[in-house]
A protein has these predicted regions:
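Catalytic cysteine-centered active-site loop
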Residues: 39-42, 61-114
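Short, contiguous, helix-prone interaction/anchoring segments in small proteins
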Residues: 49-50, 55-67
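Aromatic- and glycine-rich peptidoglycan recognition patches
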Residues: 2-5, 23-43, 47, 106, ...
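Stable alpha-helical elements in mature extracytoplasmic
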Residues: 47-51, 55, 76, 80, ...
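Bacterial N-terminal signal peptides
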Residues: 7-17
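Structural motif
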Residues: 115-117, 137
Length: 180
């Protein structure tokens, strides 16, 4: 019976911890006089999830050419650099064209995963726009002057016509930076 209540209590404590409701460990006293210390579970976040979450935190931030902060605004590559800032061992270049040439496999549209970079050709003959894939055919980007960081669909005819390639810049085993 005590094990049942302990299991029930532990399960509830873990759920609360995973939901962010518990922040400190606590002691459980059982009827038989024994006690157990329960520490909240830490839910680990993958680097790709961290990139997506950090990018989503910028939604609505104004576009600014050369911008790379929430306070001053973002251009497309500034947003990518901001979102990837906490990923260990990634030193990304600052322009969309240079980002399109970084190490990492090209990814087919049907194989996209959250955190993959999407590259577009808006004007001219080479890549000049970059975005972060979110999943379910959606991506986040800083589109252009007069706009804000927003989410668009890759299936939108404007974007699908201009899509050039996708690249996975976080190889398996990539970690979050120690301070991140």
């Amino acid at each position: 019976m005590n094990r049942f209540f302990l299991s029930l209590f532990l399960g509830g404590a873990l759920l609360c911890a995973a939901a962010g409701q518990a922040s400190a460990s606590f002691r459980v006293h059982l009827q038989d006089g024994s006690s157990h210390v329960i520490a909240p579970a830490k839910v680990e976040q993958s680097p790709a999830q961290a990139v997506v979450q950090r990018a989503l935190s910028t939604l609505g931030t104004p576009y600014r050419w050369g911008g790379s902060s929430r306070e001053r605004g973002f251009d497309c590559s500034g947003l990518v650099n901001y979102a990837f800032k906490k990923v260990d061992d990634l030193d990304l270049p600052r322009t969309s064209r240079a980002l399109s040439r970084v190490d990492g496999p090209k990814v087919a549209k049907g194989q996209l995963e959250p955190g993959d970079l999407l590259f577009f050709r808006i004007r001219g003959r080479s890549v000049d726009h970059v975005a972060i894939y979110l999943g379910n055919g959606r991506f986040i980007h800083a589109p252009s002057r007069g706009n804000t960081v927003r989410i668009d669909k890759l299936s939108n005819s404007y974007w699908s016509k201009r899509f050039q390639l996708a690249r996975r810049v976080m190889p398996e085993g990539t970690q979050l930076a120690a301070n991140g």
